[in-house]
Amino acid sequence: HQDPRTCYPGTGFTQENGFGSVKGFTLNFPMPPGTSDEKYLEFFHNRIIPQFEEFKPDFILLSAGFDGHVRDPLAMLNLTENCYREITKDMRTLAEKFANGRIVSLLEGGYDLEALALSVESHIQELLK
């Protein structure tokens, strides 16, 4: 997600990682405004996927927000539906590897309706493979 210093609601800092007995189970990876598909996917592969290797989840729950799309008026990331497709492909692969294919996706944000439709279509097509 985008750096919380630059967007609403101002939460999701790296140090916000849970509390009490679940401290450390929430991971936030804020990205600077203007982040491209290439940079986002590079970060995803190098920093996020290794977390799955360590955690080995029983199932994967995706909060599928598409407001990072370059055409979306809310965020200032420069992602495209192709980036969302690649992330979904990787998440599906992780679900197959660790969670016996168990993956649930819940729609969250996306406020440019055409960009949202393209992103959701890419996401669902990849989930169904």
Listing of model-derived features with the role each one plays in the protein:
Residues 53, 96-97:
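Solvent-exposed polar/charged
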Residues 69-72, 102, 112-116:
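Short active-site-adjacent structural elements
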Residues 97-103:
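A short helix->loop->beta-strand "cap" motif at the edges of active sites that frequently abuts
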Residues 84-96:
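Alpha-helix-loop-beta-strand connector modules within alpha/beta enzyme cores
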Residues 80-81, 113-129:
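Short, electropositive alpha-helical surface patch
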